[in-house]
Amino acid sequence: MKYDYLIVGSGLFGSVFAYRAKQKNKKCLVIEKRNHIGGNIYCENIEGINVHKYGAHIFHTSNKEVWDFVNSIVEFNRYTNSPIANYKGKLYNLPFNMNTFYQMWGVTTPQQAKEKIEGQKLLAMEAMKKEGIIEPRNLEEQAISLIGTDIYEILIKGYTEKQWGRKCTELPPFIIKRLPVRFIYDNNYFNDKYQGIPIGGYNKLINGLLNDIEVKTDVDFFKNREYCCL
């Protein structure tokens, strides 16, 4: 059978491409290495809850055309990601914003927060210079030079070491290029205008995109090059 397009991978990109191609009367074959479609946004339904197996994934965009498109396939809720960190029984809002700084230091204005952060950064840099350190040698020194000691110790160090399975002093500084800081009272993790998660899970979105399109799972393209000749 002749296909116009062989699409490797049934994640969001591959599924949208197949959907758009089908709208133009192109015949597509989608092959997927895993035993399920959806790529990294695949959901497993556990006890009635759609669990993001490779997640979590929150859809966010400021492009109304993109937002209208995905909502034409499946309805999205208005989930807003506002994480909270628990450090020794005390809660802190993330990402770093004025709510975080109030919880940490009791400051209420951006100027107070900036002075606190800059003061800690200055002390850290002076201590490094006394030891003959010109540039941060590891992630710990890099993070402190960007955000100060308190935020690093409370909200970065433990999480990062758990994530990488190594001490921050053993990790290279380039892992953290920058640390976003907001001097406003806003706990929204993203800055985009439109945010949410598909009602019914991401599988519903992928199924809608791949409706009436031929899909083969458990097919590794690199081990099944014959699909190139279809």
For each feature predicted by the language model, list its residue ranges.
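Core beta-strand elements of the Rossmann-like FAD/NAD(P) dinucleotide-binding domain
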Residues: 2-3, 224-230
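Glycine-rich FAD pyrophosphate-binding loop
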Residues: 22-47
